[in-house]
């Protein structure tokens, strides 16, 4: 499992808001999109990003600013987990992504 200095977790309402927040995080910070989860019939979206502590913190701060302005009441939570435990990374990085990466290695 790949390691990251930090993992950012964002919970927001509505898919379109999640996509916009993810786009802003990826454009503004050197973070990698790790995975998404949907609950409540797709109404609640959880995004996971990884990278250095400073870059993940920057991405999460940007999302919080969006949540206080344009998307007030849509952002439910946004946190940074510094130095995540390896078990957290196993959960965050889905087995599907690991399988896809291994398939790419075999095919290349």
Predicted regions and their residues:
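Long, contiguous binding/interaction regions
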Residues: 1-44, 50-108
């Amino acid at each position: 499992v790949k390691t990251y200095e930090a993992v950012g977790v964002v919970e927001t309402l509505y898919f379109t808001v999640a996509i916009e927040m993810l786009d802003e995080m990826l454009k503004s910070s050197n973070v990698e999109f790790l995975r998404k989860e949907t609950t409540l019939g797709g109404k609640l979206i959880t995004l996971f990003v990884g990278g250095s502590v400073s870059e993940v913190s920057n991405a999460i701060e940007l999302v919080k600013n969006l949540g206080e302005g344009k998307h007030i009441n849509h952002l439910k939570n946004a946190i940074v987990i510094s130095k995540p435990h390896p078990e957290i990374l196993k959960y965050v990085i889905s087995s599907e992504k690991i399988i896809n990466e291994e398939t790419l290695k075999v095919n290349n």
